[in-house]
C-alpha cells in the first residue's frame, strides 16, 4: 500500500472519529435528525426537505415552495446546494427523512485535515511534522463551532485549498484552479 493511500485511510478514520464524537450514533444514521438543534440547522433541513419533495425546476436549485410568498433557491440556504442537487437526483432510492448533514461533518473533518497535511508537507517535506501539524487543523475549535451551528460555514478547507493553490500550483494553472474552487464554494453556500 502506498504512503498516499495510508494517509487517506488515516485521515478518513480520524474524520469518522471526530464526526462520531460530535454526533454519536447519529453519525451512522442518515435519517436521524434528533441532533439537529440549532435554528440554522433546522432551517437547512427544512429547506432540503422542501427542495427534495418538489419537482425539478429550471434553473436547477429553484425551491419556490420554501419561503414566504416569493420562494427561494437552494443556493441561498445553508443546505449545501451541491449535495442537495446530487441527492435529489437519486431521491427515489433514499429512505424517508434522509439528510446528508452527517456526511458533511465527515467531509469537513477529512478535507480540513488532509488539505492541511498537503500544505504542511509541501512546505516541510516531512510526513511526521505534517501529520502532527494537521491534527491542529482537524480539531480546530472555530471549525467545530461552525459545524454545530451553521454547517456550510465550516468549510474552512476551502480556504486551505486556496492557500494550497497559491503555494503549489504552476502559474499557468492557478486561474483554472481558482475558478474551480470559487465555483465549488458557491455551490456549497452562496
Please name every model-derived segment.
Residues 58, 127-128:
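Membrane-interfacial loop-to-helix junctions in multi-pass transporters
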Residues 15-112, 140-155:
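Membrane-interface coil-to-helix junctions
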Residues 106, 110-122, 128-170, 174-190:
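Membrane-embedded helix bundles of polyisoprenyl
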Residues 1-10:
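N-terminal membrane topogenic signal
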Residues 11-19, 117, 130:
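Small-residue-enriched transmembrane alpha-helices
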Residues 96, 125-126:
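Short, well-ordered coil loops that connect the C-terminus of an alpha-helix to the N-terminus
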Residues 2, 35, 67-68, 129-131, ...:
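Short hydrophobic "helix-edge" motifs at membrane interfaces and signal-peptide entry regions
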